[in-house]
């Protein structure tokens, strides 16, 4: 899905390359990382809790575009005085079913942890609506930027390139930027996500293993998603097609990443899309969904009377997906930790601005299957949304 590295660690913190300023270094001693870790652990953000311990000073003084970076004096002055920082967060939209709820919960819990390290407040500049709009996201960021209301920024991009310009613009003003959820190619200090093509391969391996253990001989596959054109969706589809084609002799795909079924992110439209696809493609035996819609594929399968004959796999957590796993129609829900992605930004900002360290990209998919059981995932989801 992208060509850039996931963990950047490529920034000079000040002229020394080791500390942001002497004033900040002196103030940094009071940061309560242990307290932050406890809060992250309380919320089951275990990868982030580990990431705090893995944070380290950058290995290079160069950003992705070859420039160097120095934190703005206005920010270091705030830190030296113990003033509250403005942490800005921009994700796809505030009304995307299931996704937005988990991102909002995550950023809120992330701020809770980050405050143990540095005083800060949340400024959520994400646009309204139920689909991701790049221009609206950028406009929201610029509105805060132009009024001096950003001291650190985290972005959940649509793809690997659409936010490169705004990232460079914000960084040029001495404001740290982090990205989450999608591989990206800007000047951001670090990124917290997975590699989409590898995710697709992992999904294929899970399905192949499930087929072997359950004596399933499925041959006809299809791929789908809310926005198949997105680079992360393309990677997940491409990896899945490659993995299944290699591991299942005689496998046939009714479509690929080039023409994946577009379901939208609207629940009713997604269900209708799957019902129509299944009715129009009676030979299909397995449908990959690359985001949150697999529960609707499972529902469409059940409504068509094809339970036990057609199966699905999807990403992220929802009660509907967990129910579909328990029912045996969905093979797995690949949890990419939306809430942890949202929580990464404030914690990464606090660690960087307090100690001059960059948190590693240690995120990994956590598959939920019938074998692993759904009970823990249900508790986690309930905790996130509480």
Predicted region positions:
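Bacterial N-terminal signal peptides that target proteins for export
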Residues: 2-12
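C-terminal segment of classical bacterial N-terminal signal peptides
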Residues: 19-27
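Hinge/cleft segment of the Venus flytrap/periplasmic-binding protein
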Residues: 29-85, 244, 337-386
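Extracytoplasmic "Venus flytrap"
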Residues: 33-40, 45-46, 61-80, 84-110, ...
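Hydrophobic alpha-helical segments within soluble ligand-binding/sensing domains
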Residues: 67, 71-74, 137, 191-220, ...
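An alpha-beta-alpha
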Residues: 87-89, 93-97, 101, 107-112, ...
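Hydrophobic alpha-helical
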Residues: 139-172, 240, 258-324
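Flexible loop/hinge segments that line or gate small-molecule binding clefts
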Residues: 160-198, 318-331
